[in-house]
Amino acid sequence: SANTFYYHFQDIYDLLDKWLDRKKNQFFAMTQLTGSWTDRLKVLLHAMQENPKLVYHVSDSITRERLERYVFTSIESQFYDLIGEKTAAMEITDETRKMMTSFFCCSLLGYVMKFLWVNMNVDIDASVDDLSIIFSGALEAMLRKEMGQ
């Protein structure tokens, strides 16, 4: 009944947020030991490609801003930690690390949005491999600039 629903959730968006968080946590738990970030991204995108109806129902049910915020906040800590690993032997400020994290999150967010716009009709493995090369080059350039080279 409606009373039961509103006892557990504020509105339909609250329900969707909780469902997305649950799915995200399941995904991260399942792929935690799976190789690199690119391997995890490939698993996620293939799962999305295999379930287009679900993906588009969810993405069409929320505003673009809400979807972008959800994706960004879901990957932010992952990139922050990854950049920390890549720069462990270097002296970079936390502010620089956060700036790099924001850059990579925004870039990946754009990649995911375009993936949705083209109806997920992409060679995921090749595309993510290309993205990884671009990210590696960008990180190297950022670190060279940071170190004054």
Regions found by a protein language model. Give the residues of each.
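Key DNA-contact positions within bacterial/archaeal DNA-binding proteins
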Residues: 3
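An amphipathic alpha-helix adjacent to DNA-recognition modules
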Residues: 6-32, 38, 42-45, 49
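Amphipathic alpha-helical segments used for helix-helix packing
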Residues: 18-20, 43-74, 79-86
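Solvent-exposed, amphipathic alpha-helical segments
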Residues: 22-30, 107-118
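Secondary-structure edge/capping motif, primarily at the C-terminal ends of alpha-helices
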Residues: 31, 55-59, 86-89, 115-119, ...
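Amphipathic alpha-helical segments that line or abut small-molecule/effector binding pockets
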Residues: 38-53, 102, 106, 110, ...
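Amphipathic alpha-helical packing segments from all-alpha helical-bundle domains
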Residues: 64-90, 95-110, 133-136, 140
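C-terminal peripheral helix-coil segments that are non-catalytic and often amphipathic
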Residues: 106, 117-149
